[in-house]
């Protein structure tokens, strides 16, 4: 590979993995000069003035500039060293073997250029409190150098830790950085510091890529800080509201409990009144507990039920007893009839002369006694006769017959004695016919 001075500049870009710097090698009058691409164009930003709201009379005083950054010294390589380095074999694995492209022999080129990597601008937010150059006073002016594009820093003029906020705290200053050659993208950063009272400072940096302009401008809105009295009032109102809600729920619960207790008390009073009435109805009930009183009531009801069942059994046969009830009152005081038997001797009147006046004994005609003929006796039929079931002797009545069972009442009574009734009738007729004859035969005085 041969290089002539008449050829154009040969730009050889390569990346060194050390501190993220880019070094540019230039061919100038037979020598290779290495310069840092980051600090190729140095510029001095305009002085940043303090805000008008500081109140210390330093409205137009510029901020103090930080000490200039120490640039790396240019790397000078002698011509002999450059020649040995360029004509070295590519077979060895050097750190730049992957960066340099091999040129074909048939088509030599006058210049070789390696395009740098294009970084994609991304929107990100970083906290610059982690860097050492921001640990000091944030109001000190200075130029912020980065490995790639430059940043514009905007600061507010306020004092750290101050309790008073200046009236123009929301206004911020902006700096304009002119565009430089060879840069494809610009990144403008905005540093905004808000006054947060006693809680300290919050620093936020927003980096955004702008394609063609290098102007950065920050506009911040004032933070509305509520006083302590308002926060206390709100806290009291919230606590008061919660207490009222709790009080309302507790009142409702107490009210429902009172209603339940009142209903329970009324129910118990009614039960006690009913138990007292039950004790009065049950004889010899002196129990104090409700269970014992109920047991006595159950026993008493059972006894009454058994008595009623015993009284209802004769009432079922009341239709049969009513048929002979009128005959029971007839001839109840009549003595049994006197039946004279034949062959009996009566006392003579002579034997009773000393006792009283003698009266002739009445002569009773006796009917002819017929011999007993069993053929004339009629036997009762085997079928029961409902008329024969009725008693034929109303003069003799068993007083316990009404309590007898139905099977006892259905027994047939003994057959009547027919000879006795006929003799009574004949004797009655004879006595009535002899009375006038006796009156005629009596002597007259």
UniProtKB/Swiss-Prot annotation:
Stored InterPro entries: bHLH_ALC-like_plant, bHLH_dom, HLH_DNA-bd_sf, PIF1-like_bHLH
Taxonomic path: Eukaryota, Viridiplantae, Streptophyta, Embryophyta, Tracheophyta
PROSITE patterns, per database record: BHLH
Stretches with biased composition (Low complexity): 418-433
Domain of life: Eukaryota
GO MF terms held by the record: DNA binding; DNA-binding transcription factor activity; protein dimerization activity
Predominant subcellular localization, coarse grouping: nucleus
Biased composition (Basic and acidic residues): 231-246
Coiled-coil residues: none
Listed GO CC annotations: nucleus
Keywords, sorted A to Z: DNA-binding, Nucleus, Transcription, Transcription regulation
Compartments where found: Nucleus
Pfam families: HLH
Occurrences of domain bHLH (ranges): 255-304
The keyword Signal is assigned to this record: no
Self-association and partners: Homodimer.
Annotated spans, Disordered: 36-70, 224-260, 365-445
Entry-linked SUPFAM superfamilies: HLH, helix-loop-helix DNA-binding domain (SSF47459)
GO biological process: regulation of DNA-templated transcription
Statement: the UniProt record of this protein carries the keyword Transferase: no
Protein's name according to its UniProt entry: Putative transcription factor bHLH056
Gene source species: Arabidopsis thaliana
């Amino acid at each position: 590979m041969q290089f002539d001075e008449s050829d154009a500049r040969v730009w050889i870009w390569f990346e060194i993995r050390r501190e993220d710097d880019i070094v540019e090698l230039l061919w100038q009058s037979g020598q290779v000069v290495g310069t840092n691409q980051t600090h190729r164009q140095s510029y001095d930003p305009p002085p940043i003035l303090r805000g008008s709201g500081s109140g210390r009379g330093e409205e137009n005083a510029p901020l103090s500039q930080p000490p200039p950054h120490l640039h790396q010294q240019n790397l000078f390589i002698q011509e002999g060293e450059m020649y040995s380095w360029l004509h070295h074999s590519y077979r060895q694995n050097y750190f730049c073997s992957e960066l340099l492209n091999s040129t074909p022999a048939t088509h030599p080129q006058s210049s070789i250029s390696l395009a740098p990597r294009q970084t994609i601008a991304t929107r990100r937010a970083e906290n610059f409190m982690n860097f050492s150059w921001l640990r000091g006073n944030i109001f000190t002016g200075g130029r912020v150098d980065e490995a790639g594009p430059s940043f514009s820093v905007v600061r507010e003029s306020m004092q750290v830790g101050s309790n008073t906020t200046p009236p123009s705290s929301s206004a911020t200053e902006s700096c304009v950085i002119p565009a430089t050659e060879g840069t494809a993208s610009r990144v403008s950063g905005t540093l905004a510091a808000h006054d947060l009272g006693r809680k300290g400072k919050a620093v936020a940096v927003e980096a955004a890529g702008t394609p063609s302009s290098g102007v950065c401008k920050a506009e911040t809105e004032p933070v509305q800080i509520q006083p302590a009295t308002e926060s206390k009032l709100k806290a009291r109102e919230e606590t008061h509201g919660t207490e009222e809600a709790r009080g309302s729920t507790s009142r409702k619960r107490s009210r429902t409990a009172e209603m339940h207790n009142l209903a329970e008390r009324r129910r118990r009073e009614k039960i006690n009144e009913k138990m007292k009435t039950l004790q009065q109805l049950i004889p010899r009930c002196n129990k104090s507990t409700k269970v014992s009183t109920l047991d006595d009531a159950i026993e008493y009801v059972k006894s009454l039920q058994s008595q009623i069942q015993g009284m209802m059994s004769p009432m079922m046969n009341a239709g049969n007893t009513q048929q002979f009830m009128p005959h029971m009152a007839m001839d109840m005081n009549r003595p049994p009839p006197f039946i004279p038997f034949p062959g009996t001797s009566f006392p003579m009147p002579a034997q009773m002369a000393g006792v009283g006046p003698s009266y002739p004994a009445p002569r009773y005609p006796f009917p002819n006694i017929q011999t007993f003929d069993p053929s004339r006796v009629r036997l009762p039929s085997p079928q029961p006769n409902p008329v024969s079931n009725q008693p034929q002797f109303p003069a003799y009545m068993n007083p316990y017959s009404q309590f007898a069972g139905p099977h006892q009442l259905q027994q047939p009574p003994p057959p009547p004695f027919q000879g006795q009734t006929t003799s009574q009738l004949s004797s009655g007729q004879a006595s009535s016919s002899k009375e006038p004859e006796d009156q005629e035969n009596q002597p007259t005085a």
